[in-house]
From Swiss-Prot:
<keyword id="KW-0963">Cytoplasm</keyword>
<dbReference type="Pfam" id="PF01709">
    <property type="entry name" value="Transcrip_reg"/>
</dbReference>
<dbReference type="InterPro" id="IPR048300">
    <property type="entry name" value="TACO1_YebC-like_2nd/3rd_dom"/>
</dbReference>
<dbReference type="InterPro" id="IPR017856">
    <property type="entry name" value="Integrase-like_N"/>
</dbReference>
<protein>
    <recommendedName>
        <fullName>Probable transcriptional regulatory protein BG0025</fullName>
    </recommendedName>
</protein>
<dbReference type="InterPro" id="IPR029072">
    <property type="entry name" value="YebC-like"/>
</dbReference>
<dbReference type="Pfam" id="PF20772">
    <property type="entry name" value="TACO1_YebC_N"/>
</dbReference>
<dbReference type="GO" id="GO:0005829">
    <property type="term" value="C:cytosol"/>
</dbReference>
<dbReference type="InterPro" id="IPR049083">
    <property type="entry name" value="TACO1_YebC_N"/>
</dbReference>
<keyword id="KW-0805">Transcription regulation</keyword>
<dbReference type="InterPro" id="IPR002876">
    <property type="entry name" value="Transcrip_reg_TACO1-like"/>
</dbReference>
<keyword id="KW-0238">DNA-binding</keyword>
<dbReference type="GO" id="GO:0006355">
    <property type="term" value="P:regulation of DNA-templated transcription"/>
</dbReference>
<dbReference type="InterPro" id="IPR026564">
    <property type="entry name" value="Transcrip_reg_TACO1-like_dom3"/>
</dbReference>
<keyword id="KW-0804">Transcription</keyword>
<dbReference type="GO" id="GO:0003677">
    <property type="term" value="F:DNA binding"/>
</dbReference>
<comment type="similarity">
    <text>Belongs to the TACO1 family.</text>
</comment>
């Protein structure tokens, strides 16, 4: 079975991490700050902060940067108010996009997103036009070059997971949102994950040829180049030669 679209995109982009490290860190710091501001600075009692910090660690963000972002969040309003916006959109060939943003200027972000979509052959949808194609699940990813598949499956099943998907040397453990923290804590006693969060997962994925898929990937990357765009979730089945 093929891998989850979101992780495939993240994995594919890891080779270019150094070139975009500052931009990635900017997005992560913003997410950590907002999470701490909303739910407090305790990673154990703030699930959103825990996920944000985990992402930062996977991206090799220095511990000092993470701590500063948390302190900034719990320090209160410092004159900049951020808004969370999720745009629902269509890329070419009917690919659905969920564009998650954190912005201090809604008009600017809306204009930027619309412009990139239009130039890439996509369009903004109405609320509800795309979101019904996705559902929330806990997603934990392991590198099978580091661990044995059977070992991960044994422990994951013992933890009570919903599903395990294996492809391209990765094992993707799927849980219900409610069981995510429990399962992750159990698996952490044995394995170190590559990625872990409660994510939007597509009900069905769209398969395209390499040329078409490259066009969609380019559009997603252009959207994610904006600091205001935290991530773009999609239902594209990424061809193996592009993963």
């Amino acid at each position: 079975m093929s891998g989850h679209s979101k992780w495939s995109t993240i994995k594919r982009k890891k080779g270019a991490l150094d070139a975009k490290r500052n931009k990635i860190f900017t997005k992560l710091i913003r997410e950590i700050t907002i999470a701490a501001k909303i739910g407090g600075g305790d990673v154990e009692s703030n699930p959103r902060l825990r996920v944000a910090v985990n992402k930062a660690k996977v991206a090799n963000m220095p511990k000092d940067n993470i701590e500063k972002a948390i302190k900034k969040g719990i320090g209160g309003n410092e004159g900049v108010e951020y808004f969370e916006i999720t745009y629902e959109a269509y890329a070419p060939y009917g690919v659905a996009l969920m564009i998650k943003c954190l912005t201090d200027n809604k008009n600017r972000t809306s204009s930027d997103v619309k412009s990139v979509l239009a130039k890439g052959g996509g369009s903004l949808g109405t609320p509800g036009s795309v979101s019904y194609m996705f559902y929330r699940k806990g997603l934990i990813v392991y590198n099978l070059e580091k661990y044995l598949e059977d070992e991960i499956m044994e422990f994951a099943l013992e933890a009570g997971v919903e599903d395990i998907l294996v492809s391209n040397n990765e094992a993707e453990v799927i849980t219900s949102p409610d069981d995510f923290d429990k399962v992750l804590s159990f698996l952490k006693t044995k394995f170190k994950e590559e990625m872990a969060e409660v994510a939007l997962i597509p009900e069905n994925k769209i398969s395209l040829n390499k040329e078409q898929a490259e066009k969609i990937i380019l559009l997603i990357e252009k959207l994610e180049d904006f600091d205001d765009v935290q991530e773009v979730i999609h239902n594209l089945e990424i061809p193996e030669e592009l993963s």
